[in-house]
Amino acid sequence: MTMTDPVADMLTRLRNANSAHHDSVKMPFSKLKGHVADILKAEGYIASWKVEDAEVGKSLTIDLKFGPNRERSIAGIRRISKPGLRVYAKSTNLPKVLGGLGVAILSTSSGLLTDRQAAKKGVGGEVLAYVW
């Protein structure tokens, strides 16, 4: 059976592993998931990620990041644009997550960008997710 929304599956796996205080989470790899993991790493929400070759396909392993007392670095993560209802934002109307404390991940013509990077470049696009 094919997966309808691989990004939502990735975010759900991250959310579940984070709330269960797992050290890492494993999922099927795709280029889009790799770019989302790049953004999460650059913004400081995850410790690291790597791609492993499996017999059937590639696998993405994300190492979660926790504070000194095992407090979570990801307080919340939400999928915004879904296959049934796409959500787009113009460059003049980019979303702010928690007044700028969180990050919005956008798919633009310049690749995947955060809301701040998209505002700097002056591009809009599809709002994939909010992370805070």
From Swiss-Prot:
Transmembrane segments: none annotated. One of the primary rRNA binding proteins, it binds directly to 16S rRNA central domain where it helps coordinate assembly of the platform of the 30S subunit. InterPro entries: Ribosomal_uS8, Ribosomal_uS8_CS, Ribosomal_uS8_sf. Disulfide bonds: none annotated. GO terms for cellular component: ribonucleoprotein complex; ribosome. It comes from the Bacteria. GO terms for molecular function: rRNA binding; structural constituent of ribosome. Part of the 30S ribosomal subunit. Contacts proteins S5 and S12. It comes from Renibacterium salmoninarum (strain ATCC 33209 / DSM 20767 / JCM 11484 / NBRC 15589 / NCIMB 2235). Belongs to the universal ribosomal protein uS8 family. Keywords: Ribonucleoprotein, Ribosomal protein, RNA-binding, rRNA-binding. The lineage of its organism: Bacteria, Bacillati, Actinomycetota, Actinomycetes, Micrococcales. This is Small ribosomal subunit protein uS8. One of its GO terms (biological process) is translation.
